[in-house]
């Protein structure tokens, strides 16, 4: 390349000396043109400059595509392989990520189910604990003590007209909702009353006063009237001894002659007079 440029510099001053119009002087023009680039318009196609340059350019052109031809086919293959490797790596990462995400979902689902089971078990325990106090029947305590439930207290019964202990009262027919003990039936207060010993004597005295014979002597009736007045009082009963005494006094009064006739006329015997019943024949004669 340096030799060709030197040849061109030497040939140009010779040509330029023949044509002085193109430059100022022959000497000066040659020196200037040697330092500057060659004139392309002044050269012909048959000049050796282009002939020498053309093959070199062709050689460069031929070698340059050849190098690109050798390099270009290899680069797509490398890019393709790297791309495949990258895609495989991404797919592997995707698989790993998917597995990790799936494991996390499974763990969260297990934790949720475990928490639900614990919550259900806790709720069941709470229900049992809350239901256990309800099974115990609490007895309410009022501020004022009950007169009927006090220990060792007595209550006045208007029907019996006496004081009765709280244990002797009959139980209520309606069971109490607060007491859980079984109700025990107590003895009726009516059965607790002892029968009166003077009851049959009172009835006997009343029957004797109602069925009194009318044919007794006046003295006997007077004596009996005082006894009847005593019997009419409540709570007074005449014993059998007093009745025997009245009968003996009646017998002694019959010893007088004036009174014997009156007593002998009566058909009633002393035994019948003492009995409270009157025969049917006597009632029919009356």
From Swiss-Prot:
Entry keyword Phosphoprotein: yes
UniProt biased composition (Polar residues): 258-269
Sequence ranges of Low complexity compositional bias: 177-187, 245-256
Assembly mode: Interacts with PPP2CA and PPP2R1A. Interacts (via its N-terminus) with PPP2R2A; the interaction is direct and this interaction inhibits PP2A activity. The CHEK1-mediated Ser-36 phosphorylated form interacts with 14-3-3 proteins.
Localization: Nucleus; Cytoplasm
Keyword vocabulary terms for this entry: Cytoplasm, Isopeptide bond, Nucleus, Phosphoprotein, Protein phosphatase inhibitor, Ubl conjugation
PTM annotation, UniProt: CHEK1-mediated phosphorylation at Ser-36 negatively regulates its ability to inhibit serine/threonine-protein phosphatase 2A (PP2A) activity. Phosphorylation leads to its release from the PP2A complex and its sequestration by 14-3-3 proteins in the cytoplasm resulting in its inability to translocate to the nucleus, where it otherwise inhibits PP2A.
GO molecular function: protein phosphatase 2A binding; protein phosphatase inhibitor activity; protein serine/threonine phosphatase inhibitor activity
Residue(s) carrying Phosphothreonine: 148
Region annotated Disordered, chain positions: 1-46, 166-187, 238-286
Name assigned to this protein: P2R1A-PPP2R2A-interacting phosphatase regulator 1
Matches recorded under InterPro entries: PBIR1/2/3
PANTHER family membership: FAMILY WITH SEQUENCE SIMILARITY 122B ISOFORM X1, PPP2R1A-PPP2R2A-INTERACTING PHOSPHATASE REGULATOR 1
Phosphoserine, modified sites: 34, 36, 44, 47, 61, 75, 142, 146, 186, 188, 266, 269, 275
Family membership noted in the UniProt record: Belongs to the FAM122 family.
GO biological process, one term: positive regulation of proteasomal ubiquitin-dependent protein catabolic process
GO cellular component, one term: nucleus
Crosslink position(s): Glycyl lysine isopeptide (Lys-Gly) (interchain with G-Cter in SUMO1): 88
UniProt superkingdom: Eukaryota
Main function: Acts as an inhibitor of serine/threonine-protein phosphatase 2A (PP2A) activity. Inhibits PP2A activity by blocking the substrate binding site on PPP2R2A and the active site of PPP2CA. Potentiates ubiquitin-mediated proteasomal degradation of serine/threonine-protein phosphatase 2A catalytic subunit alpha (PPP2CA). Inhibits PP2A-mediated dephosphorylation of WEE1, promoting ubiquitin-mediated proteolysis of WEE1, thereby releasing G2/M checkpoint.
